[in-house]
Amino acid sequence: MCGDYVSVADVSGKQCYIYNGKDEGVTVETSLPIVRAKVARQGVVAILLQDKDSNVLNIYNPYSNAESLLVEIPTNVSEEGYPLDFDISPDGKSVVTSYMIAGSSDFETKVSFYNFTEVGQDKNTLVGGKSFGNKMIADVEFVSDDEVLVAHEKGYSIFGQMKQPEVVTEKTFSDSIKSLAVGDDALAFVLQKEGNAKKQTLNLYNLSGREKMQQDISYEYADMEMYGDEIIFTGNRSCNILRTNGHDKFDYHFEQEIDAVYPTSDGQVYTLIDSSTIQKIQLQTK
């Protein structure tokens, strides 16, 4: 989801649906099975496709009256590696991909940057790349039109200037990253001590790498998301909401297992989703 647009892909199938809430939506038909899809804020969609010995990342404009396929980025798995993750910039002009190349006794991970402006066209859309050695890349995600986060098991890098990508912020942690959440202007990491799964520390940074908060937490959770000034932890039947100033807002154990909790425009009302229902819940004010 990005802006007013959301993409829904038939994974292993050959259809991707794009909606903006204003019409019935449009459909992209692919020639190969779909692995994953990401959408930009104007409806341009990046779809990773699976072939027998290769992967193809296609960029489509499903609202175009002409040819909807804008760019095709092929990847040979045996030569360039297996794709781990990818993202498309909110403006639809850049894509970042992460790959793992397996050797006989070790592996290497790397990221590649593609740009679809006149600069990228001069270079067959590939405008840069970087190796992360044997650090496993967990996530690549655009944090603005021109900045992308690359997170690995021991830290992260933020690259800027997507026409000529370069590292603008970099940080390494002594502990392993358990979870990562990206907000509008902040990054939240839960770090875990090796050999002590119960020792968890939440670190909050701005996009320039300045630490905004550090706090030990003891939540049992499976998923962490950040919305505005709140971080929502969910897992099995529990939900914890922590404000970015370090104060707990909500701590509750539900009777049923929950899949997700989302905020609404009303700061005390949330949308709760479980396996069979979608409902509104209102927090009690103290």
Model-derived segments and spans:
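Repeated scaffold domains used in trafficking and secretory/extracellular systems
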Residues: 1-4, 32-43, 77-87, 128-145, ...
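Structural motif
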Residues: 14-18, 53-60, 103-115, 153-160, ...
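Non-cytosolic head/periplasmic domains of membrane-anchored proteins
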Residues: 1-98
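Hydrophilic extracytoplasmic domains
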Residues: 191-286
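A short beta-strand motif characteristic of beta-propeller blades
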Residues: 22-29, 67-77, 122-131, 165-172, ...
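Solenoidal tandem-repeat scaffolds enriched in leucines and small polar residues
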Residues: 53-151
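Short loop/turn segments that connect beta-strands within beta-propeller blades
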Residues: 20-23, 61-65, 116-119, 161-164, ...
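Hydrophobic beta-strand positions that form the internal "hydrophobic ladder"
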Residues: 6, 44-46, 92-95, 148, ...
